[in-house]
Regions:
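Flavin-binding catalytic cores
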Residues: 30, 68, 72-73, 93-132
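A glycine-rich dinucleotide-binding beta-alpha-beta segment and adjacent secondary-structure elements
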Residues: 114, 118-178
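Short acidic/His/Gly/Ser-rich catalytic and metal-binding motifs that mark active-site loops
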Residues: 82-88
């Protein structure tokens, strides 16, 4: 592992994170909100949803996402590294993991219905996915879909894509620059290609 990346892993200020999500079919053509909403988690639900807030998103602008007269809602709740690891550990017990997801889906559905009474009885859970889901699909250690959350007053540093002591190894990953994500991963891939082309050019010139 590059020294700078190892240093970030060891820096307590640099936080790794993941998230868990719920998707609901909404039996209503009209919604009481548009776009994204930040919803506070009431105290009585925080044993099941241990977060201050979650993001609620609607997709009415995507006409092909739901039949006419209906909508799709999706929630996203961020979680830190420890909680992400608990999800991954729990997923080894299929029954307990399924029950945990059902509790989350029910709690969040109730929170939404309390916030928007006009949606009460009109939501049906389609799916719940967690850090364990991301780990299963992309083999990310804690289900990270981005790298590190940047602390306040911190500038993201771009690390070199070469590892000292390893010949012909070029890294292309979101972890080379916080906060990661798809654009940085794509840029990292472009930089890896440029590095390879430079090396090949030197070899052909020599």
């Amino acid at each position: 592992m590059p020294k700078k990346l190892k240093k970030q892993y060891e820096d307590k200020k640099m936080t790794r994170f993941s998230s868990y999500h719920c998707a609901y079919a909404c039996d209503s053509a009209e919604l009481p909100f548009h776009g994204d909403m930040v919803i506070e988690v009431p105290e009585q639900y925080r044993d099941v949803v241990p977060a201050d807030y979650f993001l609620l998103r609607e997709f009415s602008h995507e006409k092909s996402f739901a039949p006419e007269g209906k909508n799709i809602l999706q929630t996203m709740t961020y979680c830190k590294e420890d909680e992400a690891k608990r999800f991954i550990s729990l997923s080894r017990d299929k029954k307990a993991y399924k029950e945990r997801k059902q509790k989350i889906a029910t709690a969040i559905m109730e929170i939404i219905a309390n916030k928007y009474p006009e949606l009460n009885g009109k939501l049906d859970c389609l799916d719940v996915w967690t850090p364990a889901t991301y780990r299963r699909f992309v083999n990310s250690e804690i289900g990270s879909w981005m790298s590190f959350a940047l602390p306040p007053r911190t500038l993201p540093l771009m690390m070199k894509n070469k590892v000292k002591g390893l010949k012909n190894v070029i890294l292309a990953t979101q972890w080379l620059q916080a906060p990661g994500g798809l654009p940085i991963a794509a840029s990292s891939g472009i930089n890896a290609i440029k590095t390879i082309l430079k090396r090949e050019k030197r070899r052909s010139a020599g």
